């Protein structure tokens, strides 16, 4: 045995000072290694739609409904199963409804407690007792453990279980216990959650989604382009901040900014009302959902004025970054100086176009990118709100702690958008700072820049460059989070000709359906073999046009969650999520979610169907997973320690 092995084993012996303790740990770990792997749940592109997100999280993309079917089969009618599922998803709210309609609550409690324990037993069967114990609420831990490990078939045991239920009911704890057991089922059904980008965007509740994630037991995030925009704003990038506010106003979703993070928009509102008092702001009218009755005409007009004000500010701020960084090669996004303020046209490389709006009271034709004193004041005040928002800064910390540009996990490669490629399908070398990087090295370098923007000393050159780069990640042509020739925001507002709105996608989107390309990318990230996959979000799958969520002969899984209602008319569905359990991969297609109220009152679940099933040749065990490989290494080291004890190379220490 080598000396460095002995040095390590000496350290290990401090945790396991006797041969018996080392042997016991080997037995425990080998038992865990032979259990079925835990279930992973993959979501992407939530876009602030918190109600649909929370529902999919609660029903685990139909996994809880499947557990209920497995347990009760034909014993319960479909309506009874729906009622039980609704109770598990929304225990507090469902209990209130039951109390209003059911006078025989004691009988209902007895039946329901029996049903919930059976579902919980099913959800817990793949885990060790120790792991299950850690998921239980402390105040009911002992009693739930007792109930989980009794079968209820033996008459004596059945009477024992009934007596426990009777005690729970008679002491007035039934509601609290039902809530606890329902939430335990939710935790047990999903072992690990992967959010493959874009928590944020136009939806009304990104802050609620982040609050929910921060309470979740195990999760990771692969940053998306909209996440990067918010992260950039939260670390002090004024251009990112202006984009965030503009998008919120464009879709009239101010809840996340105002209610969620306490961002004060009043200074912007006053400025916009004064500056654009006689301006109809027609091209800046917000895009309202058909069912949105929240805003009257006066409110819509004010939002339009604010929308225009922040958009003009954004174009000016973006010029500052473009001027500071010629290496970004984004001069083609500076367009105000191409406007002919005399005849109301703009000259682009593709031609001369009439402008849809020419009322620019804050734009000096001689110096179109200069902020007025009032505009600078608005920027400073808004930036101060973003930097001082305690909740936003806490959510930023969570995004850094649990987030990354990519993740390799159990033979799958997860990233939100793209791996930049050349026309010949090779990995594209992209400049970051003063060097070029491709593939995995590129994503590693990009992540280093993102983290530098958060941890480097304030006002240092290193930090300022990294903060600027976060805006590039939002809209830069070679950004792995964007990967399009340009973002045509200016053209979409001011030019009617839709040909100017086109955003040419990078070669990744052209070639990602090819198996050889996906295998090349997987190999770049250290993954090879038949069971490896790329799991990707970002681009909605247009199911009604025949597009499929699986490509490259099964190597590519596209799981844009389709939570954003804006895309549902073009996709025809509400997107896809993915379940990876011990039996294989299950790609689930969802219909649009109506509302939490309907889910509770009318027991209306999201209609979901499994569209792709990739079943493994054998049931996957913990030992087949990344964590299992680490545990196997621990077993190997413990066996070496046991050998060292038996040969007297290390002396046992009695406690």
Swiss-Prot record:
Enzymatic class: hydrolase
Keyword Aminoacyl-tRNA synthetase: no
Alphabetized InterPro entries for the sequence: FBPtase_class3, Metallo-depent_PP-like
Cofactor: Mn(2+)
The keyword Hydrolase is annotated on this UniProt entry: yes
Catalyses which reaction(s): beta-D-fructose 1,6-bisphosphate + H2O = beta-D-fructose 6-phosphate + phosphate
Pathway terms, separated by semicolons: Carbohydrate biosynthesis; gluconeogenesis
Molecular functions per Gene Ontology: fructose 1,6-bisphosphate 1-phosphatase activity
Family: Belongs to the FBPase class 3 family.
Name the UniProt record assigns to this protein: Fructose-1,6-bisphosphatase class 3
Source species taxonomy: Bacteria, Pseudomonadati, Bacteroidota, Bacteroidia, Bacteroidales
């Amino acid at each position: 045995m080598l000396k460095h092995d002995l040095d390590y084993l000496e350290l290990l012996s401090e945790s396991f000072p006797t041969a018996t303790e080392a042997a016991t740990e080997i037995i425990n770990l080998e038992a865990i290694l032979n259990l079925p792997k835990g279930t992973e749940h993959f979501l992407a592109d939530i876009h602030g739609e918190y109600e649909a997100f929370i529902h999919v999280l609660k029903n685990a993309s139909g996994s809880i409904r499947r557990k209920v079917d497995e347990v009760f089969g034909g014993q319960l009618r479909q309506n009874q199963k729906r009622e039980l599922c609704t109770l598990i998803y929304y225990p507090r709210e469902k209990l209130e409804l039951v109390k209003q309609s059911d006078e025989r609550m004691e009988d209902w409690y007895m039946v329901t407690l029996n049903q919930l324990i059976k579902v919980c037993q099913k959800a817990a069967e793949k885990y060790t007792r120790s792991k299950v114990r850690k998921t239980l609420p402390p105040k009911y831990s002992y009693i739930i453990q007792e109930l989980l490990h009794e079968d209820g078939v033996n008459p004596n045991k059945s009477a024992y279980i009934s007596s426990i239920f009777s005690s729970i009911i008679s002491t007035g704890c039934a509601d609290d216990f039902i809530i606890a057991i329902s939430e335990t089922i939710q935790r047990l059904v999903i072992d690990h959650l992967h959010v493959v980008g874009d928590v944020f965007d136009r939806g009304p509740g990104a802050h609620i989604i982040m609050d929910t994630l921060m309470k979740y037991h195990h999760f990771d995030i692969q940053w998306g382009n909209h996440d990067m925009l918010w992260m950039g704003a939260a670390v002090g990038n004024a251009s990112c901040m202006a984009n965030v506010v503009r998008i919120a106003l464009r879709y009239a979703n101010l809840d996340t900014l105002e209610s969620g993070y306490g961002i004060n928009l009043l200074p912007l509102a006053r400025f916009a009302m004064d500056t654009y008092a006689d301006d109809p702001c027609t091209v800046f009218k917000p895009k309202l959902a058909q069912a949105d009755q929240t805003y009257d005409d006066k409110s819509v007009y004010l939002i339009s004025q604010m929308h225009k004000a922040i958009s003009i500010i954004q174009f000016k701020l973006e010029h500052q970054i473009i001027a500071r960084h010629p290496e970004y090669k984004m001069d083609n996004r500076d367009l105000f100086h191409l406007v002919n303020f005399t005849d109301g046209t703009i000259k682009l490389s593709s031609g001369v176009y009439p402008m849809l709006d020419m009322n620019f009271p804050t734009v000096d034709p001689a110096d179109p990118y200069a902020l007025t004193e009032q505009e600078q004041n608005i920027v400073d005040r808004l930036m101060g709100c973003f930097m001082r928002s305690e909740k936003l800064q806490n959510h930023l910390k969570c995004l850094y702690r649990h987030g990354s540009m990519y993740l390799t996990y159990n033979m799958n490669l997860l990233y939100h958008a793209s791996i930049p490629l050349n026309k010949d399908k090779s990995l594209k070398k992209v400049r970051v700072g003063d060097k070029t990087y491709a593939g995995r090295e590129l994503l590693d370098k990009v992540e280093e820049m993102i983290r530098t923007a958060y941890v480097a000393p304030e006002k240092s050159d290193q930090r300022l460059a990294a903060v600027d780069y976060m805006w590039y990640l939002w809209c830069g042509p070679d950004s792995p989070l964007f990967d399009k020739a340009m973002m045509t925001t200016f053209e979409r507002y001011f030019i009617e000709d839709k040909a100017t709105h086109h955003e040419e996608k990078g070669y990744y989107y052209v070639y990602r359906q090819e198996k050889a390309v996906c295998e090349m990318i997987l190999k770049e990230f250290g993954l090879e073999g038949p069971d490896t996959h790329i799991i990707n979000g970002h681009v909605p799958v247009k199911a009604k046009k025949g597009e499929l969520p699986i490509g490259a002969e099964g190597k590519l899984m596209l799981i844009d969650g389709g939570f954003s209602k804006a895309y549902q008319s073009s996709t025809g569905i509400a997107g896809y999520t993915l379940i990876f359990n011990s039996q294989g991969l299950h790609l689930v297609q969802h219909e649009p979610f109506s509302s939490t109220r309907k889910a509770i009152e009318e027991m209306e679940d999201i209609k979901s169907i499994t569209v792709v099933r990739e079943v493994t040749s054998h049931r996957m065990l913990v030992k087949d997973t990344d964590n299992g490989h680490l545990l196997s290494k621990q077993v190997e080291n413990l066996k070496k320690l046991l050998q060292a004890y038996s040969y007297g190379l290390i002396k046992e220490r009695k406690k």
